[in-house]
Structures are given as structure tokens and as C-alpha cells.
Regions:
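Short catalytic/ligand-binding loop motif for oxyanion handling, primarily in non-cytosolic enzymes
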Residues: 15-19, 48-53, 64-67, 99, ...
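Active-site-proximal N-terminal segment of extracellular/periplasmic enzymes that hydrolyze or transfer
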Residues: 1-40, 46-47, 463-475
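C-terminal, low-complexity/hydrophilic appendages and adjacent surface loops
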Residues: 105, 179-180, 320-322, 395-469
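Polar, surface-exposed loop/tail segments
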Residues: 26-27, 56, 102, 143, ...
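Active-site-proximal cap/lid insertion segments
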Residues: 13-22, 155, 166-294, 298-345, ...
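Active-site rim elements
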Residues: 18-19, 43, 72-77, 130-136, ...
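Catalytic-site neighborhoods of secreted/periplasmic enzymes
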Residues: 55, 60-160, 167-193
Length: 497
């Protein structure tokens, strides 16, 4: 293909699919898997929504794009308007570049998408960010908007690059506050949810309670690492959960209420099903225009969700598999082959370079692209394009979390995962309010003994229960990995670390 159309679909808070129960049907996702190439060891670079999305759309690591916080308020970090995004790269190449759905890289309801290189955006981005019921409410109109755009422009003469940002399965964050049975049990929560969702100015206005679907019973067993008490893990894992639940106490699930935790997993499945219906609407539009012969489709997520693994919920300042390992499917006519799979390590930072290459961009002239090309994996799914993936996170999120070492940097080589935790104080919280203290203590250049450390052997310990960094007999190994990571950071991150 010369200058193919490119359809880029990003879901929110969706982990890699090997946890899904046997017998579950997700026909739209399965269609992509059956017709293209699945990457099973694909990782996000960072866990918060906005930093992860900044990496997707710039091809840069967090140290370069500097979006360290969710871009929810003007005082939080945002993607600079002069950032070189995929929209700008492909527009310069003669592409029509459009965007539908969640953006979350500017702290306002109507982001200046033209400044980021994208046209035809509609909606209220603050409603897409992920308040209770947002995915259930908005994914269908987002998908319909995208499908209408495809039908209107899919056969235009100029090539196009359309990005669609779906919200679900992000709604898992709010379980059980958005469940009608919970409203009946806890009627005082109704007022909170009503206030959360009653001021929408885009979408329907009659969705209280926000979720009315029945939940099928899929799970009888909790995750294998559910009982991890986290006392051998970096302090921030417990501190973040305590901070989150201190702000939202109605999200606290009784650790002994097994059925509630299982229902959470069932809800996560249901949100995948609803998201898949929205994805199907977009694929149907591609069928309607007969657009598959000259269109590349890429589906991924920004990050995953713990959903009870390690006794944790949501995505936080940790680098566990459930949060960091995410889906990636590609269907590229004449490039990928049906029902193929690659188990090679890939990173979200690789996607921008790969998409730009698909569009014919001379990536050698774009030094800001820090990822690797994934093209060798199209020919040989066993090829090795990188020796490791890098993780980074520098946000305390909730009051109190800034008092421990909340920032982290890490690497995973396919077997061993090592992460260093540093940083006390500095930054802004989830509402854009400044934490006490202007400077981060024990910062990026802190000495080895001023860190919390974490190391796992995933071949021997796939559930990441045994923190080898606490084994005094392995102290030399941990120190060596710390030095290796610091060396890589100085080579890869031009802005320091």
C-alpha cells in the first residue's frame, strides 16, 4: 500500500486478555485477532492515563514529554501545544487527521485539538476522562461519531488517520458505586453519583443509575495473588490505596467479602463486552465503505487495571503485570498475516514510530521519536526489537502519598523486572492542588540506599509475590540492576534521570 489509511483505536484501563474467562465472546476484538497480528508482551510505559497517552501520541518517554500527572486541571501537567504529535507528523505527510473520543491531555472540556494536529473532534473531554458511568454513557456516541466519520470520509481521495479514544473498561474504577443493586443497599450514595453525572452537557441525560445491565457470573476464584499483603513491597503500593480510599471511601471493598471482589471481576468482563460492542460499530462502518484493503487498523489501551490482583484496585504507582501489560492488535493488509502472534517485547513508545513509518514519514528526520520500529515483527514474529521495556511514573495522586517514595523507574527484560522507587514531595494532586514543598526530596539521582527497591523473577514467580530485592543474598544483584537501569536512563532519557 502507498500511504494507507490508518485507524487507531485506544481503549482505557484494559489489561492484556489472558485473564478473561473461557467461553467469553468478544467478537469485534476476536475479529482483529483472527485477521491480524497480536502482540502478547506489549507494555505501557507509565500507568496514569494522561502520561500514558502522551507517550502514545508523541513516541516519547515520560522524561521527555514531561506529562507526569493526569491533565485534569490547568495546574496539572499537560501536553505542550508545540509537542510533535502523530497528528502533526501525518498531517505534514498529506493525511487528513481526525480524532474522536477521549483525549485527556489538556485540562479543559474543549481541548484545542487543532493545535495538536487533529480535526473534527466533538464532545466534552472532561466527561470522557472517566467519572462514574462515563464509559457506559459515552462509548456508544463516541463510536457512532467515529462510524459516521468513516462513512463520510473513508473513501476520500486523500489518506486519513483517524484516532478513536474509547472510555471503557475504565468504569471498573467506580465499582460498586455505579451498580443499581448497590444504590438499593446504600441509598445515601445515590446523591453522590447523581451529582457526579448530573451536570453533563454532551450525551444522554437519563442514565441514573449509570449502569443497569445484569452481571453474568464468570468467576469463582479470586486472583492467585489476591492475598498479597504488600508488606514486602514498596510502601507506596499501600499508601496509594489508602490515599485513594481516603478520598473515595465508598469504593472500599471488604477484604473478606469474596463475593464482592468476584462481582468486580464480573463487572470488568461486562465492561469489555460493552466496549466490544462499540468497537463493532466502528468495524461495521469499515465494512460499509469496503475500506479494509487500504486501511491499517491498530487497537491498544493506555494501561490496565489491578482488579483485585495483589489486593489492589485501579492503576497506581506500581509496575505489576496487570497494570502494565496491555493488548495490541494490528491488521495491515499485505503486511500482517491472519491469526499470527508475537511474544516479543514491545512498548507503547514504539507505536508512534511504527505508525509514522506506515504513513511514509521519514522517521530519521524526527529525533523526538524514542521507540523502536515494530516492522521487523511483521515478517518474523520471533524477532527481537528491544532487550527490555522501560517503566516510569512520577505522580503522588492523593494527599498523603507524597510523604513516601511515590515515583518509580523500572525495566523488564522478559524475565526479570527491577524497579527503583524515589521521590518525596513535590507536584500537584488529582485536583490540581500543589502538594506541600516545592522540591522533590530523594529525587531521580538519589543514592541506592535512599530508594525502595523491587525485583521479581517472572519465570519462577509469575504472580510477582516474592520481592527478591529484600533477599540480602541478592543485594549485589539488586545493586547491579540499579546501576544498569541508571546507565540506561542516562543514555535514553535526554532530559536527565
Amino acid at each position: 500500500m502507498t500511504r494507507p489509511n490508518i485507524l487507531f483505536i485506544v481503549s482505557d484501563q484494559e489489561r492484556q486478555r489472558d485473564w478473561l474467562p473461557e467461553g467469553l465472546s468478544l467478537p469485534a476484538r476476536q475479529r482483529l485477532i483472527d485477521n491480524g497480528l497480536e502482540f502478547t508482551n506489549h507494555y505501557t510505559h507509565t500507568s496514569p492515563c494522561s502520561p500514558a497517552r502522551a507517550t502514545l501520541f508523541t513516541g516519547q518517554y515520560l522524561a521527555e514529554h514531561r506529562v507526569t500527572e493526569n491533565s485534569s486541571y490547568p495546574t496539572n501537567t499537560e501536553l505542550p501545544k508545540d509537542a510533535l504529535t502523530l497528528g502533526k507528523m501525518l498531517r505534514e505527510q498529506g493525511y487528513s487527521t481526525a480524532y474522536k473520543g477521549k483525549w485527556h491531555l489538556e485540562g479543559r472540556p474543549d481541548p484545542d485539538m487543532e493545535a495538536y494536529g487533529f480535526s473534527d473532534w466533538t464532545g466534552n473531554d472532561q466527561q470522557f476522562w472517566g467519572l462514574a458511568g462515563s464509559g457506559t454513557e459515552y462509548d456508544e456516541p463516541i463510536a457512532r461519531d467515529a462510524a459516521d466519520w468513516i462513512r463520510a470520509h473513508g473513501n476520500d481521495d486523500e489518506p486519513w488517520f483517524l484516532t478513536v479514544g474509547l472510555v471503557n473498561p475504565h468504569d471498573i474504577l467506580w465499582f460498586p458505586i455505579d451498580q443499581p443493586w448497590y444504590w438499593e443497599q446504600e441509598p445515601d450514595r445515590y446523591e453522590f453519583a447523581r451529582n457526579q453525572m448530573g451536570q453533563r452537557d454532551w450525551g444522554r441525560a437519563d442514565n441514573l443509575p449509570p449502569f443497569t445491565h445484569d452481571l453474568d457470573r464468570w468467576f469463582t476464584d479470586l486472583p492467585a495473588n489476591f492475598d498479597d499483603d504488600l508488606h514486602t513491597k514498596p510502601e507506596v503500593h499501600r499508601s496509594w490505596m489508602a490515599g485513594w480510599l481516603g478520598v473515595y471511601p465508598y469504593l472500599d471493598l471488604d477484604r473478606d467479602d469474596t463475593d464482592m471482589w468476584l462481582r468486580q471481576l464480573d463487572y470488568y468482563v461486562k465492561l469489555h463486552q460493552l466496549s466490544d460492542q462499540s468497537l463493532g460499530m466502528i468495524l461495521d462502518a469499515m465494512d460499509d465503505i469496503g475500506g479494509w484493503d487500504d486501511t491499517i487498523l491498530i487497537f491498544t489501551a493506555d494501561h490496565g487495571d489491578q482488579c483485585g490482583s495483589h489486593g489492589l484496585r485501579s492503576k497506581g504507582p506500581w509496575n505489576y503485570q496487570e497494570t502494565m501489560r496491555i493488548p495490541l492488535y494490528m491488521v495491515a493488509p499485505g503486511v500482517t498475516r491472519p491469526t499470527t502472534t508475537s511474544h516479543s517485547l514491545t512498548s507503547a513508545v514504539d507505536l508512534a514510530r511504527t505508525i509514522a513509518e506506515f504513513a511514509g514519514v521519514n522517521v530519521a528526520n524526527i529525533p523526538t521519536l524514542q521507540g523502536e520500529s515494530m516492522r521487523p515483527l511483521f515478517e518474523d514474529q520471533t524477532a527481537k526489537i528491544r532487550d527490555y521495556v522501560l517503566f516510569s511514573q512520577e505522580w503522588a495522586w492523593w494527599p498523603g502519598v507524597e510523604t513516601c517514595r511515590y515515583a518509580s523507574s523500572g525495566m523488564f527484560d522478559g524475565r526479570h523486572k527491577y524497579c527503583r522507587y524515589y521521590g518525596v514531595g513535590g507536584g500537584y494532586n488529582a485536583w490540581g492542588q500543589k502538594f506541600a514543598g516545592d522540591e522533590m526530596l530523594y529525587g531521580r539521582d538519589a543514592a541506592f540506599d535512599e530508594h525502595d527497591h523491587e525485583m521479581y523473577d517472572l519465570q519462577e514467580d509469575p504472580h510477582e509475590l516474592v520481592n527478591l530485592a529484600l533477599d540480602r543474598g541478592l543485594r549485589h544483584d539488586v545493586h547491579s540492576r540499579f546501576g544498569e537501569l541508571r546507565s540506561i536512563e542516562h543514555q535514553v532519557y535526554a532530559n536527565g534521570f
